[in-house]
Swiss-Prot record:
Enzyme Commission no: 2.1.1.-
Protein name: Ribosomal RNA small subunit methyltransferase G
Species name: Prochlorococcus marinus (strain AS9601)
InterPro entries: rRNA_ssu_MeTfrase_G (IPR003682), SAM-dependent_MTases_sf (IPR029063)
Keywords, comma-separated and alphabetical: Cytoplasm, Methyltransferase, rRNA processing, S-adenosyl-L-methionine, Transferase
């Protein structure tokens, strides 16, 4: 397949085989989009920068941390990003993709069936507020992330209960302020977590600024979290 329209910043991060899988994924998402409105980010830089690059660069940026061969959770996976992107670039990891909308998880299941992923991939239609109180899911993941779901403090309440001790949460943010940093520190203190690292990047092709906040579980999160559906969003810790 042609790759002249793929930004060089992406080509430097992934292999030829991975490029082919991302192109195949793009085709399948477009086909599903004709039946189900999954995402508007399917063409050109919208796909290659806002979906692919944005999903994978955090796992390349923190070079002191091994993200391979892990149990990975994507909360609110939507059309499969960043979870399926991580799956392509980390084929030895086990992947869990959860979303509360059945049309989204049905579509992701089709993508998983049609594309030759090497991973063991699980797709679950439920809310993290429910799953986090199930023993088979809680404290069960090395890495958990979510993209475009809510503010960092709310997202941390979703992520920390799912992590194993010393597991990592990857928070995708736009601009990052001192007040947001203070709010997050306060929340993490309650949830038995800490900020491990932070990186900022200007996305290729003028797609804006992206901050990644890497959080880590210090101890198991108190069992009362996350709170019932709606409360983390309406009343952040």
């Amino acid at each position: 397949m042609k790759k002249q329209n793929i930004p060089e910043e992406i080509l430097s991060l992934i292999t030829e085989e991975e490029i082919n899988l991302f192109q195949e994924l793009q085709i399948k998402i477009k086909e599903l989009n004709n039946k189900t409105n999954l995402t508007r980010l399917t063409d050109g830089d919208d796909y290659w920068v806002s979906q692919v690059f944005d999903s994978i660069w955090p796992f390349k940026a923190f070079t002191n941390i091994n993200f391979d061969n892990k149990k990975f959770l994507d909360i609110g996976s939507g059309c499969g990003f960043p979870g399926l992107a991580y799956a392509i670039t980390h084929p030895n990891s086990e992947i869990y993709l959860i979303d509360s909308l059945k049309k989204k998880t049905d579509a992701i299941k089709i993508l998983v069936e049609q594309i030759n992923f090497k991973n063991n991939i699980h797709v679950i239609n439920d809310r993290v507020e429910n799953l986090a109180h199930q023993s088979s899911m809680r404290n069960n993941f090395n890495i958990a992330t979510t993209r475009a779901v809510s503010n960092p403090s709310t997202v941390s309440e979703y992520i920390l209960p799912m992590l194993k001790k010393e597991g990592f949460g990857v928070l995708y943010c736009g601009k990052w302020t001192n007040q947001e940093s203070k709010n997050l520190d306060k929340t993490l203190e309650i949830l038995e977590g800490k900020v491990k690292d932070k990186k900022e990047i200007l996305l290729p092709r003028n797609k804006g600024t992206r901050n990644i906040i890497l959080i880590q579980s210090k101890n198991f999160c108190p069992e009362i979290y996350p709170r019932k559906v709606g409360k983390p969003e309406k009343n952040p810790l």
